[in-house]
Amino acid sequence: MTTTLGRAKILQSQVNKTAREEPEAFMSRCDEKYEKLVEKVLQHINGNTERSKIIMLSGPSASGKTTTSLKLKQGLERRGIRAITISMDDFFLPRELTPELPDGSRDYESVKALDIALLKSVLLQLVHEGRTELPTFNFKLGRRDKETRKVELPNGSVAVVEGLHALDPIITSELPDSHLLKLYVSVSSDFIDDGGRTILTAREVRLLRRTIRDYHFRGSSPENTLDMWDSVCRGEDLYIRPYKKNADITVNSVFDCEPCLFAHTAMKLFESIEENSKHYDRARRIIAALGTFEQMPLEIVPVSCVLREFIGGSEYYNKSTRHRTV
């Protein structure tokens, strides 16, 4: 049975009232709420150390998987449990071997974009031998580096494996279920008005996150992010959401205050979408929706907050390289 952490609908009028009256306290409460969700996962792991030798952490794009995996690692180490993190992004196939879509573009959302044989081999080595060598994918060159990184996983320690396809049976079927804990992290709440009408869908909240992150850290314009978005969503529906049911625990990574935090930056970015763009109507709809939220300054977001994964300034990343620091 899956344990679900987090609620489904968020009332905009309450969000705006709190953002207007006490923005800093609102931010703090939202952050504390997520930390408590992470703490519940840690308590579950702590009580099931043998079963949790490998934590498979999945979820769609811009869900906060990476920071959540690092928070889990940090929390485990505070409890005296040795932990390592593994990013499935390091197991991408070389660019030229990535499957193609019918239009000739590369299908980076498919599980078949990964070197599945290598990934399974690495995970099985960790389970049975307690050691392995991890690749590093060079995104600039579109291939893995020649050098690998040796890691060990002694008895009583935990590996947190994070990636879009971490719950896909293609990857997990040969791993001993007695050693696995399966997590699914995603934004799972819509923002609604007093009449129950949806203002922002959960998927649109993730689009805001991704647009801001891609612009600031991946050199991607809002137009380009929107160009990719339909393919990203198609990949979610085909390759990620069907396996949500396999999760032992699902975590809702939404922050009630995030439309208020993202509104100013996201509106400016979407305003760059020109009228002749095929994305113009979508951009204008999101701008209109964000315009109905009170705005809060990004400066009040704690450096340890998951949202820093998208706006920068996270204590979990090197400021100049965006590499993990824990």
Please give the residue ranges for each predicted region.
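Hydrophobic anchor at the beta1->P-loop junction of P-loop NTPases
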Residues: 55-57
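Conserved lysine of the Walker
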Residues: 65
